[in-house]
Amino acid sequence: MATELVQLSADDFEDAMDFMNLVFSASSPTNFPQLLPALYQPNDEMMGWNWAVRESGRIHAVVGSFPIEWQLGEIRIEMSGIGGVSSHLRRRGAGYMRQLMNHCVERMHDEGKHLSWLGGQRQRYAYFGYEKCGVGHTFNLSKTNLRHAYGDTTSHLSFEPLDATDLTHRAGCIELHDAQPYHCQRTAERFDFQLRSWKNRPYVALAPDGRMVGYLVANSSGDSVTE
């Protein structure tokens, strides 16, 4: 059976999303354009981050290699994030994932990427040079914590949802984000998509006079702040 490894384009958006949604929904209902709008849009640039194996023209496996520019003070780190790794159930064991992963890792070396990251099963991705690293911090804060730390002090800040059409406050969020010594470089449009990925919800913090003084990104249930 004829197979080919191809770079996807905007023309492949619907077929690729249908395929990936089908594969991932076998374990949990998944809609990639809704879940990760920062990565999946029907244009050539973003779809070109995805590579696929086709059999007789039909997609049977996909791996995404997504560019990330990480600013560390005055140093810029070029990264690639691996995601959307999927193989059709009837083609498990055919070697398509290995073929695509090897291709993406080889391209990273050719393009001079400094590092790559992914989330997934440790042993599965160890074959391609990935290993656990780094430290993540999670802070838990309750009303009781606040009462003991600040007493009955009342905050005069208010939080309003950031509307996708609110370009003024979006620009303010980007300015605050880019002022951090460590941050990712993002276009304005992709910045908004990033805030809303993983079903998260962005909010702007407003002073009593209406001035924007900050922003945060909460998860869909509103009980965790991710940014």
Residue ranges and their predicted role:
Residues 24-71, 181-202:
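Active-site rim helix/loop that mediates acceptor-substrate recognition in acyltransferases
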Residues 68-70, 90, 123-125, 221:
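Short coil/turn motifs at secondary-structure junctions
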Residues 110-114, 119-138:
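Conserved active-site alpha-helix within GNAT-family acetyltransferase domains
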Residues 7-22:
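Low-complexity, highly charged intrinsically disordered N-terminal segments
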Residues 50-52, 58-68, 79-86, 211-226:
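Conserved beta-strand in the GNAT
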Residues 84-87, 93-106:
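Conserved acetyl-CoA-binding loop-helix of GNAT-fold acetyltransferases
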Residues 2-5:
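Extreme N-terminal starter segment of soluble prokaryotic enzymes
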Residues 136-227:
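Amide-forming acyltransferase catalytic core, primarily the GNAT-like/NAT-type
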